[in-house]
A protein has these predicted regions:
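A conserved regulatory-domain signal marking ACT and ACT-like small-molecule sensing domains
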Residues: 304, 309-338
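A short hydrophobic/small-residue beta-strand
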Residues: 94-96
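Structural motif
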Residues: 7, 73-75, 98, 105, ...
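Rossmann-fold NAD(P)-binding glycine/threonine-rich loop
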Residues: 81-87, 91, 100-138
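Glycine-rich phosphate/pyrophosphate-binding beta-alpha loops
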Residues: 289, 293-299
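Conserved anion/nucleotide-ligand pocket segment
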Residues: 139-204
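Substrate-binding/catalytic subdomain of NAD(P)-dependent oxidoreductase enzymes
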Residues: 175-271, 276-278
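N-terminal glycine-/serine-/threonine-rich beta1-alpha1-beta2 phosphate-ribose binding loop
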Residues: 1-91
């Protein structure tokens, strides 16, 4: 029996808790061992509801509980989350997180902590939500030399661009509709300026090429300057506009960047519309492989988190090589890319 604690009961954390409770029999079958929810840390515990028996208001209760084997971090950000994840790893507890900012900015530090304490930190849900990408990239494609990983990594921007090209909406109208439908935050800066996609691109680059990439080292350009003229040009040329996060090798140089692209309508990524995400991998033996599906949302993201939990429980004693090495060789300048 493995005991799980969740830190953070927002959209994703609540989804994880629901899945752990309602799918307990299925999870036991797939993991080969019973997985039991033991505690949920939240700053605002409620006295009623299905999660009330699990609430704790002090993370120390989780950190110091010898029965808790694994901590799920769904707080977000890189301040409190970094503190809690570091403490969990030092306490000898495995960690599963969906936090792309945490991994992109502090991955090296956390990988070293996990290794030093003989535990795992897994983060499949940090890129493309419910789409299995990181595990296939590092395991299933392990016989391949990866040459490029390109992706539509942000559903908000993909929805906006789809509305502009398919329905003739202006950027402002498409953004307003995205906010009304809950696809965009009240402050959409991290999405529309490419910051969210950049964090995910850093993770993909680290896993694909084994070298650390910091978000501040890559060229980032969002979609806020895409206008009706761009949409008309794309349509006239039989193309689509997509905000892509790309990491690739070209002429012996490694590039990593985020920017809007004109792509042919026949390209694999061209047919991925609305809030969907997709990642296209180019590899030496299999050629092009496309992973596509819901890249965000309560249950898709929670599904990926629980998948990592099962992976850890199913393989007791195996400490996986997490992430990438400490080589801080910055990617080549975007100006050199052709």
């Amino acid at each position: 029996m493995k005991h799980i604690a969740i830190a953070g009961l927002g959209v994703v954390g609540g989804g994880v808790a629901e899945i752990l409770l309602k799918n307990a029999a299925l999870l036991e079958k797939n993991a080969g061992e019973k997985i039991v929810l033991k505690a949920i840390y939240t700053r605002t515990p409620k006295k009623d509801g299905p999660f009330a028996p699990y609430f704790v208001s002090d993370f120390s209760a989780i950190e110091q509980d010898p029965e808790i084997d694994l901590v799920v971090e769904t707080i977000g950000g890189s301040t409190v989350a970094l503190d809690f994840v570091s403490r969990a790893l030092k306490a000898g507890k495995h960690v599963v997180t969906a936090n792309k900012q945490l991994i992109a900015e502090h991955g090296l530090e956390l990988f070293a902590l996990a290794k030093a304490n003989g535990v795992n930190i897994l983060f499949e849900a940090s890129v493309a939500g419910g789409i299995p990408v990181l595990n296939p990239l590092t395991r299933c494609l392990g016989a391949n030399e990866i040459t490029e990983v390109s992706g539509i990594l942000n559903g908000t921007t993909n929805y906006i661009l789809t509305q502009m090209l398919e329905n003739g909406e202006s950027y402002a109208d498409a953004l307003s509709n995205a906010q009304r439908l809950g696809y965009a935050e009240a402050d959409p800066t991290a999405d529309v300026e490419g910051i969210d996609a950049a964090r995910k691109s850093c993770i993909l680059s680290g896993l694909a090429f084994g070298k650390n990439v910091s978000p501040e080292d890559i060229h980032v350009e969002g979609i806020s300057k895409v206008d009706a003229l761009d949409a008309a040009f794309a349509e006239s040329g039989g193309m689509k506009i997509k905000l892509l996060g790309r990491t690739l090798l070209q002429n012996g140089k490694r590039f990593c960047f985020v920017s809007p692209h004109f792509i042919k309508a026949s390209a694999l990524l061209a047919g991925v519309n609305g809030v969907f995400n997709a990642v296209c991998v180019r590899a030496s033996e299999v050629g092009e492989v496309l992973f596509a599906g819901p890249g965000a949302g309560r249950y898709p993201t929670a599904s990926a988190v629980v998948g990592d939990i099962i992976d850890i429980v199913k393989n007791p004693g195996r400490v996986q090589p997490a992430g990438w090495d400490a080589c801080n060789e910055a990617p080549a300048s975007f100006s050199q890319f052709h």
